[in-house]
Amino acid sequence: MLFRSVILSNALLLPACAHDILSNLDLSLPIAANAESYTDCANAAWPPSNVGVELVPQPPDDQLRAMVDEVSAENIEATITKLVSFGTRHTLSTFNSSTRGINAARDWIASEMRKYAAESNGTMTVEVQSYVQSVASRIPFPVTISNVLAKATGSEDPNRVYVMTGHYDSRVTDVLNYESDAPGANDDASGTAIAMELARVLAKHQPKSTIILGAVAGEEQGLYGSTYLAQTLKNTSTNVEGMLNCDIVGSSTGDRGQKDPFTIRAFAQGPPPISAESSARAAQRLQIGGENDSPARELARFSAEVAANNATGMNVAIIYRLDRFLRGGDHTGFLQAGYPAIRYTEPNENFAHQHQDIRTENGTVYGDLIEFVDFDFTARVGKVNLATLWSLAQAPAMPRNVTIDATILDNNSRIKWIVSNKTDVASYEVVWRSTIASLWTHMLDVGKVGYVVLPLSKDNVIFGIRAVGTNGFKSPAVYPFPA
């Protein structure tokens, strides 16, 4: 283990307010869920300190901006149109047909993914991962469930993996009705189209770490495909450091006609599930006030920092919940497997266009029809996903063994971590915020060391440690537990 240390008494605190900096991004801001939520600096300034500087979000570099610009609303529209053309993509609709049902959709998705991979010079591969699901909840007879996975293998750290999925199965009102048309244009051809579009873009840009882009099945019947994928990765000891679930990301208009075209919600669970964290660690997390600093919430903060900007044209509204109220999604299986995972969903769902038989009643059109999809909005959500995934993959790995010394009773904070021996790590940053702030508000670069003493009380702020790459990309922060 390599430890180096630094002790700080004070440092320059910049007078600029994060609100003032971010307000120059010239975005429409129907909802603010980042530093722009603060009406003035005073809200972010307690406890007062002359340590560090106010945190400025990581800007996309020229390469990432160019990649984000490649995400095409026209391509996404064409993909959703094709997926809708299969009539139904119900998990049980395993018809012997090349034009209708989930198998036909699966084969087309795989064919398109392979076309993209052919442009990658061998850095992207495509796999159709299948298994037979026996009779279970919402599965009245054995059925083959298939996930289509495009893997962009990392050039420098291929064993560090990030996953993004959308589900390509669909449904109508009766979850067991696999005969009727179930277009599923928004739920979730929109997320599937984003996964496919990102595969197209990433085939031409090899990331430093591995990115898996998946179209998964069985979601509407009980998250079967994604859970199988998560367990397969866990069983092979795959180091998944983040998972993004795109589900119902195709409409900017709510059921009351309200429009919010520049915001995407990011749902992030608090304390990890009992399958992912020991009871002792869970009890300690609650004792020290770490319930808002789970790996999932650090991932959501990271996405808000790197993907809410004028390159994507979007804001990321973090929601402190596993999912919508009493609902679930394909990130759940990853969380249960111990992986950080979040869900993106449009800001205002229209339930007349979700899980509905196609019909018109009293002048209201029901059904998940393509006419209700906003392709420009969906493309912007794709840009958020791309900016998040690329920033994760290009950054160094998260710091390991991050601890805070609780043996000394004073108003300094002593934080320790293992210094990486990787040459892509330039330094480490301590980030912090008040206990009521959603996002990190302050930062201090302490160099390539493994120990720091700060004149800030651990009683008053929340700390995190993140790695800074030689390329300028920064990892998600890691919350320190008592040593």
UniProtKB/Swiss-Prot annotation:
All residue ranges annotated as the Fibronectin type-III domain in the record: 396-483
Glycosylation sites: N96, N121, N235, N310, N362, N401, N411, N421
Pfam families assigned to the protein according to its UniProt record, in alphabetical order: Peptidase_M28 (PF04389)
Sorted UniProt keywords: Glycoprotein, Hydrolase, Metal-binding, Metalloprotease, Protease, Secreted, Signal, Zinc
Cofactor entry: Zn(2+)
Organism superkingdom: Eukaryota
SUPFAM superfamilies in the cross-refs: Zn-dependent exopeptidases
Signal sequence segment: 1-18
Binding site for Zn(2+) 1: H167, D187, D247
GO CC terms, sorted: extracellular region
Predominant subcellular localization, coarse grouping: secreted
GO BP term (any one): proteolysis
Cofactor remark: Binds 2 Zn(2+) ions per subunit.
Chain sites annotated for binding Zn(2+) 2: D187, E220
Gene Ontology terms for molecular function: metal ion binding; metalloexopeptidase activity
InterPro entries: M28_fam, Peptidase_M28
Subcellular location per the Swiss-Prot or TrEMBL entry: Secreted
Enzyme class of the recorded protein, top EC level: hydrolase
EC number: 3.4.-.-
Family as reported in the entry's similarity comment: Belongs to the peptidase M28 family. M28B subfamily.
PANTHER family assigned to the protein according to its UniProt record, in alphabetical order: METALLOPEPTIDASE M28 FAMILY MEMBER (PTHR12147), PEPTIDASE M28 DOMAIN-CONTAINING PROTEIN (PTHR12147:SF26)
Name by which UniProt lists this protein: Probable zinc metalloprotease PTT_08196
Lineage per the UniProt record: Eukaryota, Fungi, Dikarya, Ascomycota, Pezizomycotina
